[in-house]
């Protein structure tokens, strides 16, 4: 019995129990080792003309014996001598593949794809096996050797027999564990089924470059006997056939010009279990200090759980065609969590188990490039296939908005131009850039209204007042919309026609254009303004003076109405924004009525201490109701002022989509007036 090199027992125990968290990856590791062995022989044949190989014969085979509880992984690669068995398997964390890559770094090309790095993958076999036997015959050698170990005390190396060069790794699986206190147990029998092994091969090693073959069970109809009568019923028999389990050539490594759309669509649907074709396919290859391939998909519809806390984002990460992580969330920002796809790079730094990535600049560089590619593709769809983009935005636009809000506006530069909102004027979805292009020259802000439906918002007096002045209003109907705009604070509209300070400058610019010069443009910083919040400063000087005069003349009335309404409002004032409606509720400060409603709709309602919107009851001094209020004040009719104040406040709330605090009292007051 030979002892493992290094602190073998402790290190091997650490390997089995700590480094790997998922026992099923043992097959991935052993298949990767087999692939490396075949690659080494392939490389040898390229360097040495005396080594004759038929490329079609290079393969890896996986088999199992349920009764003997064994799994065998075989290859016809370069094999190992007794000394190499001692060095590679007797020394934990010595990587023959890494040594090979180092020694032949300058000579390797695209024909060689060595996977191993750390020299520990082989020992993952002991997570599932109580005994491991390795039979290997090195290429060009007559003798074979057998390495055996139970993973505890040590190992033996003896002479053996093998018909040709290559290696067999034979695992004797552990017995199933008994149920623990939590009712859980490891069932190793799951690895002793055809379906179980095929599933693991296709999940982790589907794109290993050499065929991975298995004998699989099939059924076929027996030949019909010549003397069979009319009542003959077909008979079937089971048989076994050698089948290649893996796809070998990953579709993401092919040039996109060589792949048809239907092939991308089929790969997407089968890999990501979707019934619909993807809306967009993005394929690219990056070269330089960091080389990788990426194949990304924008789904045609949102998964049902996209906005649930259980949804997991991430791209499948491969290294040299071997699956490392099924969902690497570091490769996607949260606002692109809907994107599915694959990134494959031999250059990323893995941890020793290859189950996870080490956080490093390489990963960040890939993620940054992936994000840029997604953004560019979405911009292309927005500009060249608007119908498809609007459908995409209906599915995934909420996440883009949340990306701006959750970053406190830091991502606005990247995402703002991808957003769509309903235009009250154009009666369609438009971008912020399109809104800006359609603004009158004197407009200095982007106006919006927020609520639960476009139909209700379009009828609001404050919206109608802005539209009547010739300005468009964006109608925001998702909960996150106004929070997004508050995080942005402003939108920088690029390439806007330059506004000149005086007529002389304007005339000079117009003359230059007439003489063939390009029109001057500028970036314009546009504030995002809620039409129901604060002072929009849209009134003319005459309208402002009328409002000021009405306010001064009726200070006692407004004081009486404020007293009647109590802390429901901050103040009562004359409005310069209303045209037809008798009253409206606006707010001062950062919290609008709609934002207050959204916060109150949380799972536990409005949190204690949450600030309330600072409501202002604005009155239309030109409306007949205002004249009645003035008359009541002059007559000293405090009861009528109180009744009118409550009615106007409650009806203004209804216009905002908010029920009165006391609907019964509101209905009674209306009936009383009737």
Placement of each model-derived feature along the sequence:
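GHKL (Bergerat-fold) ATPase N-terminal catalytic module, capturing the glycine-rich phosphate-binding loop
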Residues: 1-187, 191, 199, 222, ...
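GHKL/Bergerat-fold ATPase module in large chromosome/replication-associated machines
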Residues: 114, 132-154, 174-179, 183-674
């Amino acid at each position: 019995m030979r002892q493992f090199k290094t602190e073998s027992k402790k290190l091997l125990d650490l390997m089995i129990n700590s480094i790997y968290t998922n026992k099923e990856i043992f097959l991935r590791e052993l298949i990767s080792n087999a692939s490396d062995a075949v690659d080494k022989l392939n490389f040898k044949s390229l360097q040495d003309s005396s080594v004759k190989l038929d490329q079609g014969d290079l393969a890896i085979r996986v088999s199992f014996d349920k009764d003997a509880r064994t799994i065998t992984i075989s290859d016809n690669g370069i094999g190992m001598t007794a000394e190499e068995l001692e060095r590679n398997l007797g020394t934990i964390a010595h990587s023959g593949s890494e040594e090979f890559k180092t020694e032949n770094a300058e000579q390797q090309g695209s024909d060689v794809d060595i996977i191993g790095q750390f020299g520990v993958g082989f020992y993952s076999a002991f997570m599932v096996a109580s005994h491991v036997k390795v039979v290997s015959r090195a290429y060009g050698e007559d003798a074979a050797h057998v390495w055996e170990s139970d993973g505890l005390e040590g190992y033996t190396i003896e002479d053996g027999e093998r018909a040709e060069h290559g290696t067999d790794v034979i695992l004797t699986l552990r017995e199933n564990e008994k149920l623990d206190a939590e009712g859980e147990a490891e069932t190793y029998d799951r690895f002793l089924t055809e379906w179980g092994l095929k599933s693991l091969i296709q999940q982790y090693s589907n794109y290993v470059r050499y065929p991975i073959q298995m004998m699989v069970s099939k059924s076929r109809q027996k030949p019909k006997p010549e003397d069979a009568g009319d009542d003959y019923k077909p008979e079937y028999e089971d048989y076994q056939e050698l089948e290649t389990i893996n796809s070998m050539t990953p579709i993401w490594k092919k040039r996109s010009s060589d792949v048809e759309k239907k092939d991308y669509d089929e790969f997407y649907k089968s890999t990501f279990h979707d019934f619909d074709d993807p809306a967009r396919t993005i394929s690219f290859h990056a070269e330089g200090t960091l080389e990788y391939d990426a194949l990304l998909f924008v789904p045609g519809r949102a998964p049902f759980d996209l906005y649930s806390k259980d949804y997991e984002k991430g791209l499948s990460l491969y290294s040299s065609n071997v699956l490392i992580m099924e969902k690497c969330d570091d490769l996607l920002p949260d606002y692109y969590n809907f994107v599915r796809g694959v990134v494959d790079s031999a250059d990323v730094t893995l941890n020793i188990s290859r189950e996870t990535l080490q956080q490093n600049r390489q990963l960040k560089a890939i993620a940054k490039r992936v994000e840029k590619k997604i953004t560019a593709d979405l911009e292309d769809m927005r500009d060249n296939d608007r119908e498809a983009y609007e459908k995409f935005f209906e599915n995934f636009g909420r996440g883009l908005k949340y990306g701006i809000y959750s970053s406190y506006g830091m991502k606005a530069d990247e995402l703002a131009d991808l957003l769509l909102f309903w235009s009250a004027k154009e009666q369609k979805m438009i971008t912020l850039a399109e809104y800006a292009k359609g603004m009158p020259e004197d407009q200095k802000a982007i106006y919006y209204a927020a609520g639960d439906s476009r139909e209700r918002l379009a009828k609001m007096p404050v919206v109608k007042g802005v539209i009547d002045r010739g300005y468009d209003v964006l109608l925001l109907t998702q909960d996150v919309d106004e929070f997004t705009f508050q995080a942005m604070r402003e939108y920088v509209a690029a390439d806007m026609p330059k506004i000149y300070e005086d007529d002389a400058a304007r005339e000079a610019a117009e003359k230059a254009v007439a003489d063939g010069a390009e029109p001057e443009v500028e970036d314009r910083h546009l504030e995002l303004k809620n039409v129901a919040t604060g002072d929009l400063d849209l009134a003319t000087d005459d309208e402002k003076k009328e409002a000021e005069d009405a306010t001064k003349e009726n200070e006692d009335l407004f004081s009486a109405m404020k007293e009647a309404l109590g802390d429901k409002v901050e103040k009562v004032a004359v409005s310069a924004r209303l045209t037809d409606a008798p009253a409206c509720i606006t707010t001062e400060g950062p919290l609008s009525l709609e934002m207050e409603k959204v916060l109150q709709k949380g799972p536990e309602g409005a949190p204690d201490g949450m600030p309330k919107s600072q409501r202002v009851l604005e009155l239309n001094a030109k409306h007949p109701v205002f004249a009645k209020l003035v008359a009541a004040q002059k007559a000293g009719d405090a009861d009528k002022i109180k009744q009118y104040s409550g009615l106007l406040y409650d009806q203004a709330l209804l216009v905002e989509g908010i029920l009165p605090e006391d609907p019964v009292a509101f209905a009674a007051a209306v009936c009383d007036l009737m």
